[in-house]
């Protein structure tokens, strides 16, 4: 395993660890999810370029689309929770049910 792959895996692991440790605030969780998506995007791009698999060249773009959708939904949820309750605790998400 090359040093680049190892660094990307470490970045993904640190983001996952941050998501597990700082899950009380919604903003921290969203930042850790974005770090994980960025690591997956870079890893998939490098792997596709290294194996010269041109048919799979759309996979990183699709991953970026899903990451953008996840970020938009997460930020809108963050705005809704912070406007309603004044704080961005994840435990307040249970109170938003109809």
Swiss-Prot record:
It holds the Pfam family Oxidored_q2. Signal peptide: none annotated. It catalyses: a ubiquinone + NADH + 5 H(+)(in) = a ubiquinol + NAD(+) + 4 H(+)(out). GO terms for cellular component: mitochondrial inner membrane; respiratory chain complex I. One of its GO terms (biological process) is ATP synthesis coupled electron transport. It is found in: Mitochondrion inner membrane. GO terms for molecular function: NADH dehydrogenase (ubiquinone) activity. Its EC number is 7.1.1.2. Keywords: Electron transport, Membrane, Mitochondrion, Mitochondrion inner membrane, NAD, Respiratory chain, Translocase, Transmembrane, Transmembrane helix, Transport, Ubiquinone. It is a multi-pass membrane protein. InterPro entries: NADH_UbQ_OxRdtase_chain4L/K (IPR001133), NUOK/Mnh_C1-like (IPR039428). Belongs to the complex I subunit 4L family. Core subunit of the mitochondrial membrane respiratory chain NADH dehydrogenase (Complex I) which catalyzes electron transfer from NADH through the respiratory chain, using ubiquinone as an electron acceptor. Part of the enzyme membrane arm which is embedded in the lipid bilayer and involved in proton translocation. This is NADH-ubiquinone oxidoreductase chain 4L. It comes from Talpa europaea. The lineage of its organism: Eukaryota, Metazoa, Chordata, Craniata, Vertebrata.
